[in-house]
């Protein structure tokens, strides 16, 4: 009973010590609870010291790594000042090293995070090494404890402190690097915001100026004071309903430039508002470091947004441009006038037909509206004179119905007498095409290998140098895109000539050595698969397997049928 009371008193003092910590996280060895525990130690009572050691171990086993570090300071203080407390620890150090150094991580692991556990281990190793220097010469138990810690595989007694120190330095280096990255990112975002802010201030001034010019304000004058309520003796009252208060601006020659500047500034400001929104969103991952900059960007964006919304209230009425109808024909084609022969042929055909009136109206409509309906291209029916054009043929024999020809309803004509065709069939017809040849006065002017310029004239394309383009006195294209096309054409021509030259060299080599040169095989996936799949042996093997599978399946399903056999 007395021992329990004594333990409860020690626990109270220990809890008060842990509660009365200093600002730097160390124990206050001048406090009253610590002096009470120290007085218990100084009594040199073995039972009291044993109870104190057990209470400290129980408190450490129930606490986290942070509180264990404070208890470890008490262990170090009492270990150095009390021989009885030192004997209690060195007689059975197993529980102490399990709690402080995690020598049995499976059954008794350290609570909390890994970083806190490593910090507790490093401090414990530092204290134990200090104990070894002080008491290892005179106390064999201290030597045994050090040897045990050196042999255990869960504690790196020699290099553990170095590794923990390296881990701490690496963590500090990473924190410093992260801080530098954050600072660099903040400076980059800040410079971007300053650039955008300069541009936005200029656009803001331009937008406000154009708004004042388009919709001037008459309320800024302080010369005339108009009272809000004017006294009147009349009993009549009027009600006015204004449907829309937003101003309407009609575009004319006087304010065209102002309206254009107003719309341009408003459009660019809308884009800048979106850019500032993206900047503020990009600063969110930086959390505390970028909150102030993000808040300033958001506040400035809201101011510009209000100005843009105010500018949106102004309605602008523009004149509708006349819609130009698209041309139905291409400009590359040339209109051909209707020839007199065509008109006469139509008239003669109309006189011979029964419906003269209906047929006469069509050419009149064509002549009256030549722009609406295009003239049809003249064509002639195909005949033997076109097939044998330029040849003189007379009394051409025509074969009879030979038996080798296909016929179904009548029998073959067995006579071998050939017939003749009338001479008029082969008489060459004459066609008159009336029209004016287009004038061609555009020269190619491309530079020839001799240094002179190509004098070939054509309408659209030179057969040697491609489409006709504008060139200067040296034969170089004037436009950049034409110059790039010219360079591309020359490069393709050079590659083609090089390929032909290499092919010619290969042929000469093969003719001299009388053996063909091995060409490089393709190394693509498709070529390798083709070589494997289309190999004759592979096809034969696969087809044999497929045939045997089909035969076995047929025999299994239809072997009992007589027709299958």
Curated annotation (Swiss-Prot):
The keyword ATP-binding does not apply. Residues 11-156 are annotated as: VHS-like. Its main location: nucleus. It comes from Caenorhabditis briggsae. A zinc finger (UVSSA-type) spans 441-468. Residues 510-530, 542-565 are annotated as: Disordered. Factor involved in transcription-coupled nucleotide excision repair (TC-NER) in response to UV damage. TC-NER allows RNA polymerase II-blocking lesions to be rapidly removed from the transcribed strand of active genes. It is found in: Chromosome. Signal peptide: none annotated. Zn(2+) binds at residues 444, 454, 462, 465. One of its GO terms (molecular function) is RNA polymerase II complex binding. The keyword Lyase does not apply. One of its GO terms (cellular component) is chromosome. GO terms for biological process: response to UV; transcription-coupled nucleotide-excision repair. This is UV-stimulated scaffold protein A homolog. It comes from the Eukaryota. The lineage of its organism: Eukaryota, Metazoa, Ecdysozoa, Nematoda, Chromadorea. Residues 155-215, 480-510 form a coiled coil. Keywords: Chromosome, Coiled coil, DNA damage, DNA repair, Metal-binding, Zinc, Zinc-finger. Belongs to the UVSSA family.
